[in-house]
Design a protein with these regions (language model features):
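The feature marks the mature, well-folded catalytic cores of soluble enzymes
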Residues: 1-162
């Protein structure tokens, strides 16, 4: 018996009273207009959004890295981006990152985002990596000097399209 098993055995032997686990039913926050809340959350975290009635053209995208986001979260302004390319480093090396997300893919909260990811059984078969990205990279020193782009993009713009 190794140390771990010995410790667990001793714990089990000394547990005298067991309790049923309570049911935890956490409901995430809901918004009347998740898209509007998502836009506000992006502004709060120093990001930007552009809402289009039609997808942006190449000249509107500019000369920055552009990627499609699968899920946008109204609660905190983050976007789920799965790995579709072999190289994912552009998500973090770009000076400016544009993310395109559909209005129908804006959810209220992280609970709904993870439920949507989990509901897609093909998701993790097709993708090796996924990340939530939220606003530009920021850091501050002890004096409170805020620096953008310290670990990733200096600016993030989310294009909300139909």
């Amino acid at each position: 018996m190794n140390s771990r098993e010995d410790i667990l055995k001793r714990i089990r032997e000394n547990v005298h009273e067991r309790y049923d686990m309570p049911e935890i039913n956490v409901k995430g926050i809901q918004f009347a207009d998740p898209v509007e809340q998502f836009i506000n959350a992006c502004k709060t975290i120093s990001g930007a959004t552009v809402s289009f009635d039609t997808p942006p053209s190449d000249d509107q995208r500019g000369e920055t890295s552009t990627v499609r986001g699968d899920i946008a979260v109204a609660e905190n302004g983050c976007v789920w981006i799965p790995q579709r390319e072999d190289d994912r480093s552009f998500l973090f090396k770009s000076e400016h990152l544009n993310i395109i997300v559909s209005r129908k893919d804006v959810v209220n909260n992280m609970h709904e985002a993870y439920d949507r990811i989990a509901a897609s059984t093909e998701y993790f078969k097709d993708y090796k990596f996924g990340t939530f990205i939220s606003g530009p990279s920021k850091t501050a020193d002890i004096e409170g000097a805020l620096v953008y782009g310290a670990q990733a993009a200096r600016s993030v713009t989310v294009y909300v399209v139909p």
